[in-house]
Amino acid sequence: MSRISMEQVKHVAHLARLAITEEEAKLFTEQLGDIIQFAEQLNELDTEGVEPTSHVLDMKNVLREDKPEKGLPVEDVLKNAPDHEDGQIRVPSVLE
């Protein structure tokens, strides 16, 4: 794969709605090019006989069983709330 161009960096920045300067675009072009070049080195590895994996370790589901449990009583929760009304925690408005 060829190195990434400055136009590609600017295009990705535009898609991500990032305002970048010319200096930043040049820096990111160099940095991304180095990253791509480093990743391309993986193509040179001999993977003959290596089975594809999705995890480095042979792990199964390590999560605990999901069991429903009783929560705190509403009264105890409201004791910790700075403001409440009608059994609901009141928070500052986030919409105008």
From Swiss-Prot:
GO biological process, one term: translation
InterPro entries reported in the protein's UniProt record: Asp/Glu-ADT_sf_sub_c, GatC
Keyword Nucleotidyltransferase: no
Signal sequence interval, chain numbering: none
UniProt KW keywords: ATP-binding, Ligase, Nucleotide-binding, Protein biosynthesis
GO terms, molecular function: asparaginyl-tRNA synthase (glutamine-hydrolyzing) activity; ATP binding; glutaminyl-tRNA synthase (glutamine-hydrolyzing) activity
NCBIfam families recorded: gatC (TIGR00135)
Summary of subunit composition and partner proteins: Heterotrimer of A, B and C subunits.
PANTHER family xrefs: GLUTAMYL-TRNA(GLN) AMIDOTRANSFERASE SUBUNIT C, MITOCHONDRIAL (PTHR15004:SF0)
Family label: Belongs to the GatC family.
Protein task: Allows the formation of correctly charged Asn-tRNA(Asn) or Gln-tRNA(Gln) through the transamidation of misacylated Asp-tRNA(Asn) or Glu-tRNA(Gln) in organisms which lack either or both of asparaginyl-tRNA or glutaminyl-tRNA synthetases. The reaction takes place in the presence of glutamine and ATP through an activated phospho-Asp-tRNA(Asn) or phospho-Glu-tRNA(Gln).
Protein name listed in UniProt: Glutamyl-tRNA(Gln) amidotransferase subunit C
Organism annotation: Halalkalibacterium halodurans (strain ATCC BAA-125 / DSM 18197 / FERM 7344 / JCM 9153 / C-125)
